[in-house]
């Protein structure tokens, strides 16, 4: 007897896929025979035991983790060498031997014991080695016999894996005093070769219980024990005696120990798991007890062998008569640390177990003798017992006799018995029509059979069903092939084999039978390799061996080339040469399943045909593109020939822009390949998921129908929520199947695939219970009614959509205020989230620039210093769909935050809960600050990533059920959305031209521009003869004019030419106007026409499609709920389409649609009409639609009238301005060969040229843009001294240059071209009712293309956010040049007006760039707003309209006392051309006027005034101040006193190096003093300078302004007096026309006081609180209640109406305006009689209504109300200019409404106005109420 300890080995397996995906680290290492387990948590303190590595020593340690580490790696051969060879030797020596593997699920036990075909494990190697050795050693002196048995222990029950009868019956375990524990009835089969063992083992494995768990896809769910008995017989030839040694090998493969949480076990899996764990726990306890015994701790300790079947059967192997080896298998991953530690501890304990092995020599003789003695003893006992009454004794006797019989069976008998069992098995299965394959038993060549295809890869093709001549298939017992499961009827199908050998399949009525994916309802012939589906999931493949061999022979006879051609047609079915039923890769379970689904979807593989059609389309596009390219090259060659002819040699440079680059083809190919690969990949993955979804839906529908749940499931498609996140990885799935659940009478629900999958488990259980229950039991019946996994009565929140805020703005020191689109899972914008993101501290830029220096700083210090603190504000969500707007909340995670931030809305309890609006708004007012360590990853995230904010809402009833579907509100909302969509593809761009001439100092200064009524180009440039000139061009985007991401980089070229001389045109009246006269302005409508044609085409196509679809639906008889929904949707879209068509044909003013009449008042120098330039880019990616290469230059074809390409001369650019898109080009006007340009322009002629520039754009596409501007120039000769002096003394025009505003349109808005709602598309793409329909392909393709748009939405929005940030940076850069920035009161919210609530949102003052509503801004564009609006500092490009009226106010103050006004001063009152006050003045960096009030005071002598004069100096000092300080007097003073006068001087700040137009406050102006200043003008003019600080010490400043007149209780200067009716305050100057008021004498004493701007309330704020000053509805009428004082000077005007003045009369208003009288009568706004005139030209102020009252009707901008005295009779017919597209840019002018002014000042103003009538715009008349 040899005592030996259990040999223990540990094996470490490689990482599996799950662990690799988790990126878990390796914690196990091997050093010789030691295993080191490192701690997972390295952050523990040094003294903590958990932080120390644990070391275990074993007999063998196998490192199988990484094959590349050759010196360490232990493969299967090394494991066998160390353990197997020793055990094999023990078996030959006659010892019992055992080897078992122990470890958690998936640790590699089965691999170590059984291995794979390529890498066999311990058991196959032991068996193979056993037979190799027996064959070697067998001779006449010794022989070997081998017997095997194979059993499994499953759920504590023992099953025989080699029993052919009923493999499911369980066997009993018994214990015998002699034999020990054994299994009663376990088959023991004799084997003669390794092949026999292999086949038996394979057969057993197939019967073994295997199932997938999370840890391991083919996890053993049972313990398997393979026993080999080796009988070694020794013959002594001499003596003739023989002896036997018997060795027993027990090879045990244990099931994995597991944790339910990790393996995801549930239901049966959990039950199995608990039993597996029970056996293994008992095994552990047995090992512990035996280890304790061996260590001598507790010799008598009880060993609980019988607590589990496993340990009972292993009793001999553990601590008994056996030599045992144990392999502990562990995972190296940190994720499995606890399990690994537990396994290593058990293995460590097992080392101490001592076994007592003895050699089993000649056991038979001894055992038989013992047994015989026992039998005799039992017989005696039985005889003594009465009449065999003891059943126990009888059992024991039978047991012993049976054992003796088994012992005495000869070897030959054993072999015969094994053969009989095999034959019996074959017969039994054949009787069932089944044959078990791969067991070494050959299938008959002549038999036809079916092979099963199974979802479980381990069970695939295990069953073979033989077909008889007439085979019945069904679920009844009488059928030949019995199938059970869903969809199988008792009699399902019949298969017949005809005499010719053909196989015919005949399905029964109403059965579900498919052949090769197609449904079958009539008899059909089957062929070799056909796939058959019966019911829901019984898939089979047919094998016809004869047919197959015949085909093979024909194949060999065929010509090789023919063979290749046909190979594809044979479907690779016949590559079956190795085995009749070998696994055919092409026809596995998944293939068969997919085939059925694809056929059901309408074609064998719709995706394939989609790709083919795409390919064809692509080829055609390529062909047509090449044809276009050829034509373009020819065109270009022709142009080159023309250009290079000798007389035109210097015409223009060729590098305007190139149409194509040589790499065009290559780039196109690369782009197409990438796009095709993405589409292909997406289609493939989507196809797989659709297949799965359709299978689940089919099953769910079947169960729901069976249980009468009235619920229907359909597959639809949606965009995965992860794909809406801009941070997602590229190439992720664009779309995924979702399940639409609909219950009769209830709304729709959308479930995810996972949800249906989980629900199906409940449905199946319910179905099974329903099948098994008694139908007549009322309790059961009510239970089935209540149990409802089929539909959710209460739905949780749904995802409305995801808003992506790109974080690039955190690199800059600006606040990003933006309305981010919320994109839903249909790929549509479902609203906007108003967000602010801002960096509070930390500098990302410096860290990047720091480079290596930063790296040198210690890490701790670095993390402390480099922190970025930013603020995220979520203000509100607007435009949300009504049916999802309940309990809306947001969720987002910022960078590495562990927990997501949940943002709840602010609840306003006062407002009603139900809103009638189709769209809702939710206020959050959430603000959060985040502090993040700046790392390389974080910087990358900032530059590439976005903050994805998910917006959720709770659904209310099905929106389609709402009666409000046809509400006008919904149609209006759609029209509003049309306006918004246009605003997303448009942006206005200003193009300014200045001509610079060299002055006496050699500097280039802008020439003067004078406006003229007959010149529509914005003004006439006054050039001097013989001067050196430059053309300065500037291009800039207009803020808040649309959200197209338009960014100009630089000006590439400047050209000038096309000189046209025109006679001076008389002012346009009805007599002189001819429609055919060409307009010499910069307007053209070529691009507009092109855009309209394209849009109309798109609408027409869409209309045809909608009509066709509606027709289909109308003609359909049985409409489903889906059809009714779709019909309603289509009708709604058809209605919206009509609105849209009207919008194209006749866009309403201010609608924001290109070509709509403009509603604006252009600044001086700007043209009235706005031409459109259509870039025609691809809506998807802003690439060109027509060209292979870069987009052609936008606007190249938009030529002006009279433009000739040959007449242009390219100018050399001599200066580019940094930070602005501005360039100067040198211009020699002599090259044009035009005498009027060289020697001077005659007085009666106008000279026009065209300036053309090419601008490089970076956004929306990298392309060029061609802009043209027509200019008018006047060249005058050299002036004499008198003229020069006069010129210097007279006023210089304030117009800096001429400009034109373009409306740039990138493309037709995407949704305008969209055909059908994506929801409907998705549903139709996933389900097509008619399989023959070609629509299925179209729907899927259409849907996928619409889904691809999401990526474009994100890309575009990223561009918009970039542009918003860059514009803020530019604005900031400009502002920083000024000392203090002025308050920007005029910033309007660009968010939808209809969504803005009545309450304010705190800081919600910024513009929301992305949701600009062009037509609904706060100030109506048809009117000039009240003077309250200060000037926005963004656009530093136009003179402020107001400053023109101040032009005279900086002249020598001494002259102000001269009572008589010289005629020379007429020119000092230029045209009052004011606009809304949006544009800032270029004067922001120039001398800013400061105004001082001089109050009359009798006690101060004139000498004080004279003393004050030297202080002021020649330059005039002007101080900005608010309105109240400008008000001179509230009422006419009773005692006549000298009126106050405003002294104005200029403060010149430090000169700036900036080329700009000279200030109208020029020092060169003459020294006269202005007698008239308008308050409105002052506020507008001085807006930008409100905060400009005066140089300290320039003048003494008094603490407050003195009262203006000696009134007893003077009001404070900052308050509006109560006794005066509210109204715009005006300042007027004394005049000489009123004889009752004296003009001031030159010697009047004045005291000069300084008024500080800080002491005055801002004019805007004062007006904001003054109800009379809010902008009127139309026109700037004086507010009601202004009373007679509002027009003080009108008291002198006669209100008598001449007899001829009646409605319909043709009249002249002022000097130039003509029109028809439409109204004569009183008005609400002012007493007296007023005349309403409809003008011929849009130079009016309104549409006939003022203050909300309609006096007459006309087009906006054509109406005017005046006093009767301003109207005189005209002669001739009425004419009206009508060019359709140029209707409307009303040249609105604001007049100075006089109120509360001293009468003497008013009269002087009136006099000046009359004196200036011939020169001034008549619109500046005081009596107009406009």
Curated annotation (Swiss-Prot):
Chief localization: cytoplasm
Q: Give the FHA domain ranges.
A: 471-535
Output the Gene Ontology terms for molecular function.
14-3-3 protein binding; ATP binding; ATP hydrolysis activity; microtubule binding; microtubule motor activity; protein kinase binding
Organism superkingdom: Eukaryota
Q: How is it modified after translation?
A: Phosphorylated at Ser-1381 and Ser-1410 by MARK2, promoting interaction with 14-3-3 and inhibiting microtubule-dependent accumulation and formation of axons.
- Which residues fall in a compositionally biased region of kind Low complexity? 1579-1607, 1671-1688
Task: Give binding positions for ATP.
Answer: 103-110
Region feature (Disordered): 546-582, 1367-1420, 1579-1650, 1662-1698
Phosphothreonine occurs at which residues?
1545
Q: Which CDD domains match?
A: FHA_KIF13B, KISc_KIF1A_KIF1B
The annotated regions of Polar residues compositional bias extend over: 561-570, 1378-1392, 1409-1420
* Listed result of changing residue 1381 to A: Abolishes phosphorylation by MARK2
The answer on whether this UniProt entry bears the keyword Protease reads no
Q: Where are the transmembrane segments?
A: none
Which positions carry the signal peptide feature in this UniProt record?
none
Q: What UniProt keywords apply to this chain's record, in alphabetical order? A: ATP-binding, Cell projection, Coiled coil, Cytoplasm, Cytoskeleton, Microtubule, Motor protein, Nucleotide-binding, Phosphoprotein
Listed under GO cellular component are:
axon; cytoplasm; kinesin complex; microtubule
Q: Does the keyword Coiled coil apply?
A: yes
- Phosphoserine found at: 661, 1379, 1381-1382, 1391, 1410, 1432, 1438, 1537, 1559, 1644, 1797
Location within or outside the cell? Cytoplasm, Cytoskeleton; Cell projection, Axon
- Tell me the GO BP annotations in alphabetical order: microtubule-based movement; protein targeting; regulation of axonogenesis; signal transduction; T cell activation
What is its biological role? Involved in reorganization of the cortical cytoskeleton. Regulates axon formation by promoting the formation of extra axons. May be functionally important for the intracellular trafficking of MAGUKs and associated protein complexes.
Q: Which family does it belong to?
A: Belongs to the TRAFAC class myosin-kinesin ATPase superfamily. Kinesin family.
Q: How does it assemble?
A: Binds to DLG1 and DLG4. Interacts (when phosphorylated at Ser-1381 and Ser-1410) with 14-3-3.
Q: Protein name, please?
A: Kinesin-like protein KIF13B
Species the sequence originates in: Homo sapiens
What is the taxonomic lineage of the source species? Eukaryota, Metazoa, Chordata, Craniata, Vertebrata
């Amino acid at each position: 007897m040899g005592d030996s300890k259990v040999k223990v080995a540990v094996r470490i397996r490689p990482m599996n896929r799950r662990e690799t995906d988790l990126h878990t680290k390796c914690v196990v290492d091997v050093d010789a025979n030691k295993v080191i387990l490192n701690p997972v948590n390295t952050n523990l303190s040094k003294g903590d035991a958990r932080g120390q590595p644990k070391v275990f020593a074993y007999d063998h340690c196998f490192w199988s983790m990484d094959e590349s580490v050759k010196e360490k790696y232990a493969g299967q051969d090394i494991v066998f060498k160390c353990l197997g060879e020793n055990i094999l030797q023990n078996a030959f020596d006659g010892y019992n031997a055992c080897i078992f593997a122990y470890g958690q699920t998936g640790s590699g036990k089965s691999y170590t014991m059984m291995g794979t075909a390529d890498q066999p494990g311990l058991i196959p190697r032991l068996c193979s080695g056993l037979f190799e050795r027996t064959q070697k050693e067998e001779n006449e002196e010794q022989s070997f016999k081998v017997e095997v048995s194979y059993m499994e222990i499953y759920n504590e029950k023992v099953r025989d894996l080699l029993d052919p009868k009923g493999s499911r019956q369980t066997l009993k375990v018994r214990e015998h005093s002699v034999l020990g524990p054994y299994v009663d009835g376990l088959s023991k089969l004799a084997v003669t070769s390794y092949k026999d063992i292999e086949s038996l083992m394979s057969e057993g494995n197939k019967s073994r219980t295997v199932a997938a768990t999370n840890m391991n896809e083919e996890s053993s769910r049972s313990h398997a024990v393979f026993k080999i008995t080796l009988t070694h017989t020794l013959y002594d030839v001499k003596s003739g005696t023989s002896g036997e040694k018997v060795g027993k090998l027990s090879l045990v493969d244990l099931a994995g120990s597991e944790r339910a949480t990790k393996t995801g076990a549930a239901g049966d899996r959990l039950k199995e798991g608990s039993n597996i764990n029970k056996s293994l726990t008992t095994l552990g306890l047995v090992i512990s007890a035996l280890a304790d015994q061996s260590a001598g701790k507790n010799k008598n300790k009880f060993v609980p062998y019988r607590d589990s079947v496993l340990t009972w059967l292993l009793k001999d192997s553990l601590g008994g008569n056996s030599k045992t080896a144990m392999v502990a298998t562990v995972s190296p991953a940190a994720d499995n640390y606890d399990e690994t530690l537990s396994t290593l501890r058990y293995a460590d304990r097992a080392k101490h177990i001592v076994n007592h092995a003895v050699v089993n020599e000649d056991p038979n003789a001894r055992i038989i003798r013992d047994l015989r003695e026992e039998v005799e003893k039992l017989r005696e006992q039985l005889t003594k017992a009465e009449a065999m009454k003891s059943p126990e004794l009888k059992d024991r006797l039978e047991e012993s006799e049976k054992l003796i019989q088994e012992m005495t069976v000869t070897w030959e008998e054993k072999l015969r018995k094994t053969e009989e069992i095999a034959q019996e098995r074959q017969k039994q299965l054949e009787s069932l029509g089944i044959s078990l394959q791969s067991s070494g038993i050959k299938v008959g060549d002549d038999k036809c059979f079916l092979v099963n295809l199974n979802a479980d890869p381990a069970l695939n093709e295990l069953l073979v069903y033989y077909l008889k001549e007439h085979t019945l298939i069904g679920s009844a017992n009488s059928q030949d092939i019995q199938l059970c499961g869903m969809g199988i009827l008792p009699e399902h199908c019949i298969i017949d084999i005809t005499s010719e050998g053909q196989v015919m399949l005949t399905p029964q009525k109403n059965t579900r039978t498919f052949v090769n994916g197609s449904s079958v309802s009539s008899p059909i012939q089957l062929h070799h390799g056909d796939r058959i589906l019966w019911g829901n999931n019984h898939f089979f493949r047919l094998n016809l061996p004869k047919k197959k061999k015949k085909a093979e022979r024909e194949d060999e006879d065929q010509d090789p080339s023919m063979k290749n051609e046909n190979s594809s047609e044979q479907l690779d079915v016949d590559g079956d040469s190795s085995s009749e039923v070998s696994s055919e890769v092409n026809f596995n379970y998944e293939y068969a399943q997919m085939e059925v689904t694809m056929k059901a979807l309408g074609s064998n593989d719709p995706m394939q045909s989609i790709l083919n059609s795409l390919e064809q389309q692509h080829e055609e596009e390529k062909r047509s593109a090449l044809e276009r390219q050829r034509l373009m090259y020819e065109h270009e060659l022709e142009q080159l020939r023309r250009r290079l002819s000798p007389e035109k040699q210097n015409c223009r440079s060729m590098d305007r822009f190139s149409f194509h680059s040589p790499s065009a083809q290559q780039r196109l190919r690369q782009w197409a390949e990438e796009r095709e690969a993405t589409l292909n990949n997406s289609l493939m993955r989507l196809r797989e998921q659709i297949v799965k979804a359709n299978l689940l839906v089919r099953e769910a529908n079947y169960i729901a129908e069976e249980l009468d749940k009235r619920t229907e499931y359909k597959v639809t498609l949606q965009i995965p929520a992860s794909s809406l996140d801009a941070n997602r990885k590229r190439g992720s799935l664009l779309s995924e199947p979702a399940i639409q659940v609909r219950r009769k009478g209830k709304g729709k629900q959308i479930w995810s695939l996972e949800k249906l999958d989980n629900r199906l488990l409940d449905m199946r259980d319910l179905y099974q219970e329903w099948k098994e229950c008694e139908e007549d039991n009322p309790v059961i019946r009510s239970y089935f009614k209540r149990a409802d996994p089929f539909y959710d009565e209460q739905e949780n929140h749904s995802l409305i959509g995801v808003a992506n805020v790109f974080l690039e703005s955190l690199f800059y020191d600006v606040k990003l205020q933006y309305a981010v689109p919320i994109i839903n899972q249909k790929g549509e914008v479902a609203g906007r989230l108003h967000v602010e993101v801002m960096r509070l501290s930390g500098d990302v830029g410096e860290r990047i620039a720091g480079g290596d220096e930063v790296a040198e700083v210690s890490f701790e210090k670095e993390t402390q210093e480099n922190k970025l603190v930013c603020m995220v504000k979520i203000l509100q969500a607007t435009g949300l769909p009504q049916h999802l707007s309940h309990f809306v909340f947001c969720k987002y995670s910022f960078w590495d935050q562990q927990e997501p931030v949940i943002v709840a809305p602010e609840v306003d309890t006062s407002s009603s809960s139900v809103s009638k609006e189709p769209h809702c708004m939710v206020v959050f007012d959430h603000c959060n600050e985040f502090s993040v360590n700046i790392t390389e990853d974080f910087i990358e995230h900032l530059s590439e990533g976005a903050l994805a904010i998910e917006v959720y809402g709770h659904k209310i009833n099905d929106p389609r059920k709402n009666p409000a579907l046809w509400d006008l509100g919904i149609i209006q909302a759609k029209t509003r959305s049309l306006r918004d969509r246009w605003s997303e593809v448009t942006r206005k761009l200003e193009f300014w031209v200045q001509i610079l001439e060299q002055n006496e100092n050699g500097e280039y200064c802008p020439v003067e521009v004078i406006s003229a009524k007959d010149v529509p180009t914005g003004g006439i440039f006054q050039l001097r003869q013989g001067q050196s000139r430059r053309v300065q061009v500037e291009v800039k985007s207009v803020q808040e004019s649309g959200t197209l991401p338009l960014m100009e980089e630089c000006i590439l070229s400047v050209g000038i030419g096309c000189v046209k001389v025109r006679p001076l045109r008389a002012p346009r009246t009805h007599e002189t106007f001819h429609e055919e006269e060409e307009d010499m302005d910069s307007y053209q409508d070529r691009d507009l026409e092109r855009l309209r044609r394209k849009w109309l085409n798109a609408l027409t196509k869409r209309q045809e499609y909608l009509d066709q679809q509606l027709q289909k639906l109308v003609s359909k008889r049985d409409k489903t709920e889906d059809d009714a929904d779709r019909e309603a949707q289509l009708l709604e879209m058809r209605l919206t389409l009509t609105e849209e068509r009207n919008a194209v044909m006749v866009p309403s003013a201010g609608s924001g649609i290109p070509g709509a009449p403009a509603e604006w008042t252009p600044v001086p120098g700007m043209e009235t009409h706005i031409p459109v330039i259509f870039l025609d880019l691809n809506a998807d990616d802003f690439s060109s639609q027509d060209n292979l290469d870069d987009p052609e230059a936008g606007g190249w074809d938009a030529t002006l009238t009279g433009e000739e390409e040959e007449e242009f001369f390219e100018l050399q650019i001599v200066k580019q301005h940094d930070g602005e898109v501005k360039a100067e080009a040198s211009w020699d006007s002599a090259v044009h060969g035009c005498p009027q340009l060289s020697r001077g322009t005659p007085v009666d002629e106008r000279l026009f040229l065209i300036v053309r520039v090419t601008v490089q754009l970076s956004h929306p596409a990298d392309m060029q843009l061609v802009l043209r501007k027509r200019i008018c120039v006047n060249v005058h000769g050299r002036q004499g001294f008198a003229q020069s002096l006069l010129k210097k003394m007279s006023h210089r025009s304030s117009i800096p240059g001429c400009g034109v505003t373009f409306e740039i349109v990138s493309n037709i808005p995407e949704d305008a071209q969209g055909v059908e709602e994506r929801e409907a598309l998705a549903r139709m793409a996933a389900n097509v009712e008619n399989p023959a329909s070609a629509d299925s392909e179209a729907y899927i393709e259409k849907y996928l293309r619409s889904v691809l748009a999401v990526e474009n939405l994100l890309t575009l929005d990223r561009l918009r956010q970039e542009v918003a940030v860059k514009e803020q940076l530019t604005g900031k850069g400009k502002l920083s040049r000024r000392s203090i920035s002025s308050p920007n009161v005029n910033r309007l919210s660009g968010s939808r007006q209809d969504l803005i609530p009545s309450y304010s949102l705190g800081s919600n003052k910024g513009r929301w760039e992305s949701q600009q509503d062009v037509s609904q801004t706060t100030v109506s564009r048809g009117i000039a707003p009240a003077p309250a609006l200060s000037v926005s500092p963004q656009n530093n490009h136009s003179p402020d309209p107001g400053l023109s009226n101040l032009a005279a106010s900086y002249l020598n103050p001494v002259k102000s006392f001269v009572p008589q006004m010289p005629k020379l001063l007429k020119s000092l009152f230029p045209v009052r051309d004011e606009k809304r006050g949006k544009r800032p003045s270029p004067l922001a960096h120039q001398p800013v006027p400061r105004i001082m009030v001089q109050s009359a005071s009798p006690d101060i002598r004139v000498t004080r005034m004279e003393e004050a004069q030297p202080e002021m100096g020649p330059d005039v000092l002007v101080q900005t101040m608010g309105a109240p300080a400008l008000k001179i007097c509230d009422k006419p003073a009773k005692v006549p006193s000298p009126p106050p006068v405003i002294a104005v001087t200029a403060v010149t700040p430090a000169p700036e190096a900036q080329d700009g137009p000279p200030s109208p406050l020029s020092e060169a102006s003459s020294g006269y003093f202005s007698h008239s200043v308008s308050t409105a003008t002052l506020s507008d003019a001085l807006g930008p300078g409100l905060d400009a600080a005066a140089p300290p010490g320039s003048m003494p400043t008094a603490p407050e302004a003195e009262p203006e007149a000696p009134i007893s209780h003077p009001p404070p200067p900052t308050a509006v007096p109560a006794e005066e009716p509210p109204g715009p305050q005006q300042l007027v100057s004394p005049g000489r026309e009123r004889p009752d008021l004296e003009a001031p004498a030159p010697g009047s004493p004045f005291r000069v006081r300084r008024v500080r701007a800080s002491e005055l309330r801002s004019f805007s704020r004062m007006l904001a609180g003054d109800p009379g000053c809010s902008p009127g509805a139309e026109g700037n009428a004086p507010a009601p209640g202004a009373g007679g004082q509002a027009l003080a000077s009108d008291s002198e005007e006669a209100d008598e109406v001449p007899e001829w003045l009646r409605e319909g009369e043709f009249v002249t208003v002022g000097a130039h305006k003509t029109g028809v009288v439409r109204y004569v009568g009183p008005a609400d706004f002012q007493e007296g009689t007023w005349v309403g005139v409809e003008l011929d030209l849009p130079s009016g102020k309104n549409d006939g209504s003022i203050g909300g009252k309609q006096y007459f009707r006309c087009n906006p901008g054509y109406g005017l109300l005046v006093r009767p005295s301003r109207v005189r009779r005209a002669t001739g017919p009425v004419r009206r200019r009508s060019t359709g597209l140029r209707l409307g840019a009303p040249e609105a002018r604001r007049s100075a409404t006089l109120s509360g002014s001293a009468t003497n000042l008013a009269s002087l103003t009136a006099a000046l106005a009359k004196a200036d009538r011939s020169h001034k715009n008549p619109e500046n008349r005081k009596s107009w109420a406009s």
